[in-house]
Curated annotation (Swiss-Prot):
Designated name of the protein: Butyrate kinase
SUPFAM superfamilies: Actin-like ATPase domain
Annotated source species: Clostridium perfringens (strain ATCC 13124 / DSM 756 / JCM 1290 / NCIMB 6125 / NCTC 8237 / Type A)
Its job: Catalyzes the conversion of butyryl-CoA through butyryl phosphate to butyrate.
A biological process from GO: butyrate metabolic process
Subcellular location: Cytoplasm
């Protein structure tokens, strides 16, 4: 049976929605919200009714009867660290999303919006593989400073979706393979997937790992300390250097990887150096994750928007092909990944996990 699903993926200035019948998309809309609209609300949670009304209005205009839905799926937010999987939205989750236990983020509305709409029609609401998925082994958490443990914050939804896609296409299960998955977008995350669990991954939000179009990745800690206490920068300014204005933005004043690729292809000296450093750091991180997996790697999977570039993927492959074969799934399809997570539960392939 093809289940009819509403998928909700809230961003800071837009809400992306999709309606699926099974894995077939029958509607996709990006509902843009102006700065004026968003600024009316003091907190992200205060936007709930406004966003819900916009979603229901668009569905009505497009002739979608919400009473025909089998479930509603939201993007998971900044919850407590949890293992990967599909979770049924419950009161404990809604409360934690309201307060944002790991910080405010538009995705916190995903679970709440899906729950609100599902309650109206007496159906179930789910979230799938939020950014806070944490399956790291204890040995990977130590950083050298007890007060600064390493944290698992990465592109869990897309990493898990492409890992499962690889397993399916190779007639095996995600729980039977060892993969290194590299998501390359505004941030870069490199995860070691061992038998269905991401046992180590760089904190792609504001932690360690390769630099990216907008993020600094791992930086020399002594110099960072000097910068923090130099009196020249506020806390917010230093954070911006790490997230938002780091990486390509800092070196080349662009957050578009295509600009760097073009400079490199044209032989521009500075552009080539930045591009080569980007490739170098990703390859180095892949090598590090190969060690985490004891050298037992079935494949290296590249994904995210930057993986559309053969120039990038070929450059990485040149450095890491001795580790394992490379597979490329360019881009990311978060709506489909959310739909697939719910379908696995509705079909009885997986059980819905309980958030506590």
């Amino acid at each position: 049976m093809a289940y009819k699903l509403l998928i909700i993926n809230p961003g800071s200035t837009s809400t992306k929605i999709g309606v699926y019948e099974g894995e077939k998309e029958i509607l996709e809309e990006t509902l843009r919200h102006s700065a004026e609209e968003i600024l009316k609300y003091d907190t992200i949670f205060d936007q709930l009714d406004f966003r819900k009304e916009v979603i229901l209005k668009v569905l009505k205009e497009k002739g979608i009867d919400i009473n025909e839905l089998d479930a509603v799926v939201g993007r998971g937010g900044m919850l407590k660290p949890i293992e990967g999987g599909t979770y049924e939205v419950n009161e404990a989750m809604v409360e934690d999303l309201k307060i944002g236990v790991q910080g405010p983020h538009a995705s916190n509305l995903g679970g709440i919006l899906s729950n609100e709409i599902a309650k109206e029609i007496g159906k179930r609401a789910f979230i799938v593989d939020p950014v806070v998925v944490d399956e790291m082994e204890d040995v990977a958490r130590l950083s050298g400073v007890p007060e600064l443990p390493r944290k698992s914050k990465f592109h869990a939804l897309n990493q898990k979706a492409v890992a499962k896609r690889y397993a399916k296409e190779h007639n095996t299960s995600y729980e039977d393979v060892n993969l290194i998955v590299v998501h390359m977008g505004g941030g870069v995350s490199v995860g070691a997937h061992r038998k269905g669990r991401v046992i180590d991954v760089n904190n792609a939000l504001d932690g360690d790992g390769p630099f990216s179009p907008e993020r600094a990745g791992g930086v020399p800690s002594g110099e960072l300390l000097e910068m923090c206490f130099s009196g020249k920068y506020s806390k917010e300014e230093v954070y911006k250097k790490l997230v938002g204005k780091g990486g390509f933005v800092a070196y080349a004043n662009t957050n578009d990887a295509r600009d760097l690729i073009k400079l490199s292809q044209e032989g521009d000296e500075k552009g080539s150096l930045i591009f080569n450093a980007f490739i170098y750091q990703i390859a180095k991180e892949i090598g590090s994750m190969a060690v985490v997996l004891d050298g037992e790697v079935d494949a290296i999977v590249l994904t995210g928007g930057i993986a559309y570039s053969d120039y990038v993927t070929n450059a990485i492959n040149k450095k890491v092909k001795w580790i394992a074969p490379m597979v490329v799934y360019g881009g990311e399809d978060e709506l489909l990944a959310l739909a697939q997570g719910a379908i696995r539960v509705l079909d009885g392939v997986e059980e819905a996990k309980i958030y506590k």
